[in-house]
Structures are given as structure tokens and as C-alpha cells.
Swiss-Prot record:
Keyword hit for Signal: yes
Keyword hit for Signal: yes
Alphabetical list of NCBIfam families matching this protein: PRK05303.1
Keywords for this protein: Bacterial flagellum, Periplasm, Signal
Subcellular location: Periplasm; Bacterial flagellum basal body
Name of the protein in question: Flagellar P-ring protein
A Pfam family annotated for this UniProt entry: FlgI
Record lineage: Bacteria, Pseudomonadati, Pseudomonadota, Alphaproteobacteria, Hyphomicrobiales
Role: Assembles around the rod to form the L-ring and probably protects the motor/basal body from shearing forces during rotation.
Superkingdom of origin organism: Bacteria
BP GO terms, sorted: bacterial-type flagellum-dependent cell motility
Signal peptide range: 1-28
Length: 373
């Protein structure tokens, strides 16, 4: 049996890898499901005010937080306990705000997560239990009711002379802590048309989505209204069954387009640049000026019998150093990788790079939008 050359096997493997990589690069497409949302299908924010009990002396100070005391009195009175005029001394209760997101198409009886945040001067919500709390929508109606034990991500420990805090112990979560009591009606199947809202507005992407839908259905039922909206008229065979149509459409592959953009976070020095960033011909010079000041006080000691006194005289040393300036010419139409490599060759760090990119943009030599966070 003839032996297969190891060299040929390696060449074949390398060729196969190259073909796979080129195929992946050529098919930089995304599903419509990942590029756009269906207009009207969204979460709704809920909020409520409640009490957390069972805290180990880390709750609100009732004398300092009057609304906690009033809420506790009102709750006990509803349960038949009259404490009007009585002195309440407890550190185991905290007033909190409860927030959550009502999922789209949520039905009665399903559950949702909620976040519980201290409203007063409570130090720690660890070990606490949220009492029944109605959650209201923007229209004032109650859509869910929350209750349960809190899970805290942070903690706090203290002694007589020291205190340690990790994370935020005054915020906690209750997984599946709210039961949905009211549904938001949305008759999707009865809509004559549906709008797709692009997550990143772009004329080209909107046109490509409409073209992909029309090609798939074989009829012109989708049209871009603006860079962020594509309107889809429900064809006759899908009347009353828009869900089936959207299930098929959201799986279609589209190659999204995006404007050249550079995002800069000045606090952390992070710079993110898209692949379409191009730079015109420009010269870049970078030099660092360093001023150092050092103080070394000197003591002047008189002779033992001289009658003088000991004094301290300041001795300041000031030094100025400037790194050798470097000048580089960035040629017209260079890509992102070439730009980064060229600036790195000058010994430029991320924070210096931020200023250079802004200066290149001000000179009109960079073809991209710069967003500073």
C-alpha cells in the first residue's frame, strides 16, 4: 500500500483551513432576528414600594427615616395591630423600591425577576424578606405582585474599630419573585402590517432586509420607510397568522452595513474601531515633555560653641526631559490595522492614541465618526 506523504497531508490541511476561513469571512451575514425587533413587542418597566423585614439590626433607623415608620404602622394597622402613639424601636425593617421588567406576551400566573433597592439608611439587606409588594406600570395599574427572600451580591462586616464592605449590600434580587397578575394585550395576528425596527439605523441594511424578504416571499410586500424601519404588509396566505410569517422571516440571512465609527472611553483608555475606518494622508508627531521636581531638605548644624541654632534649608531640584519627537506619515486610505501598527511603532499608548485620533479627525483626515463615552 503506497504511503501518503506527510508534506502533502499538511498542504491539504492548510488549504482546507484557508477555504474554511475564506468562507467564514465571505459570509459575514446575520439573521434578521438579530438585526431588528418587531415594533410593539417590548418589555414594560414596573415599580413598587415595599418593606423588607428580618434584617439583623441593619435596617432603617426609624427616627431618621419617617416614611419607613409610617409604612410599618400602616401595615400593622391593616393587620389589626394598633400601635398609634407607641414607640417603635427596631432595626430589622427597611423601606425599599422594587423594580422589574414585564416580558412581552407574559400571561397571568407566570413569574418574573425583581430587583430590590434600599430607600432609607439601611446598611445591609442580607437575610431580609420582601413583604407583598404590588408592582405598577406607567399607567398606574398593578401588573404583578412581588414577595420573597433576597439574594445579595455584596456583604458588609464591621467591628468596633474596622468595617469591610464588598459590592453593594443594599441592593438584592429575587429570582422569579413576582407573579404576573395582569396581561398586556397585543393582537399580533390581527395586524394588517408589521414594522421591523432596526437596532442600528442604516439605509443600506434596511434596503437589504426589505430585498431579502421580498425575494423569499416572491412578492413586494416589504419596503424601507427610513433607516431604522422596514414595513411588512402581511400577504394574503398569512392573514390572521402573522406569527408563522415572522417565524420564517426572522431566519433570513442579511449582510448588515455600518458606518465607519470609532468609540473612545476616556476613563479606561479603551478604543474600539470598526473595520471600515480609513485615514487620508496625514503626518503625526508625538513627543512627551516630563517635568520632575524633587525636594531634599538639608540640615545646617552649627559648631558646638558657636552660639548658633540648627536650621533646615530647602534644596529643590527641577529637571525637564523631553522624549525624542518622532514624525510619521500615514498614507492615504490605510486600514484600521495599518493605522494601529503605525501608531504603535511610534511608541504611542492608548491614552495618547485618543488625542491623536481626535486631532486627525479635526484635521479632516479620518473618515469615521468619533464617539467619546
Amino acid at each position: 500500500m503506497p504511503r501518503v506523504s506527510t508534506h502533502l497531508v499538511k498542504l491539504a490541511a492548510a488549504a482546507l483551513c484557508a477555504l474554511l476561513l475564506s468562507a467564514v469571512a465571505a459570509s459575514a451575514t446575520s439573521r434578521i432576528k438579530d438585526l431588528a425587533n418587531i415594533e410593539g413587542i417590548r418589555q414594560n418597566q414596573l415599580i413598587g414600594y415595599g418593606l423588607v423585614v428580618g434584617l439583623n439590626g441593619t435596617g432603617d433607623t426609624l427616627n431618621n427615616i419617617p416614611f419607613t415608620k409610617q409604612s410599618l404602622q400602616a401595615m400593622l394597622e391593616r393587620m389589626g395591630v394598633n400601635i398609634r402613639g407607641a414607640t417603635i424601636r427596631t432595626g430589622n425593617v427597611a423601606a425599599v423600591m422594587v423594580t422589574g421588567n414585564l416580558p412581552p406576551f407574559a400571561t397571568q400566573g407566570t413569574r418574573m425577576d425583581v430587583t430590590v433597592s434600599a430607600l432609607g439608611d439601611a446598611k445591609n439587606l442580607q437575610g431580609g424578606t420582601l413583604l407583598v409588594t404590588p408592582l405598577l406600570g406607567a399607567d398606574g395599574n398593578v401588573y404583578a405582585v412581588a414577595q420573597g427572600s433576597l439574594a445579595i451580591g455584596g456583604f458588609q462586616a464591621e467591628g468596633e474599630a474596622a468595617k469591610i464592605t464588598r459590592g453593594v449590600p443594599t441592593v438584592g434580587r429575587i429570582a422569579n419573585g413576582a407573579i404576573i397578575e395582569r396581561e398586556i394585550e397585543f393582537a399580533l395576528n390581527r395586524l394588517p402590517n408589521v414594522r421591523l425596527a432596526l437596532r442600528n439605523a442604516d439605509f443600506t441594511t434596511a434596503k437589504r432586509i426589505a430585498a431579502a424578504v421580498n425575494d423569499y416571499l416572491g412578492t413586494k410586500c416589504a419596503e424601507p420607510l427610513d433607516p431604522s424601519t422596514v414595513q411588512l404588509s402581511i400577504p394574503g396566505e398569512f392573514k390572521g397568522n402573522a406569527v408563522a410569517l415572522l417565524t420564517e422571516i426572522e431566519q433570513l440571512q442579511v449582510e448588515p452595513d455600518q458606518a465607519a465609527k470609532i468609540v473612545i472611553d476616556e476613563r479606561s483608555g479603551i478604543i474600539v474601531m470598526g473595520r471600515d475606518v480609513r485615514v487620508a494622508t496625514v503626518a503625526v508627531a508625538q513627543g512627551n515633555l516630563t517635568v520632575s521636581i524633587s525636594e531634599s531638605p538639608q540640615v545646617s548644624q552649627p559648631n558646638p560653641l558657636g552660639g548658633g541654632r540648627t536650621v533646615v534649608t530647602p534644596n529643590s531640584r527641577i529637571g525637564v526631559t523631553e522624549d525624542g519627537k518622532k514624525l510619521a506619515v500615514v498614507k492615504d486610505g490605510v486600514s484600521l490595522q495599518q493605522l494601529v501598527d503605525g501608531l504603535n511603532s511610534l511608541g504611542i499608548g492608548p491614552r495618547d492614541l485618543i488625542g491623536i485620533l481626535q486631532a486627525i479627525k479635526a484635521a479632516g483626515a479620518i473618515e469615521a465618526d468619533i464617539e467619546v463615552m
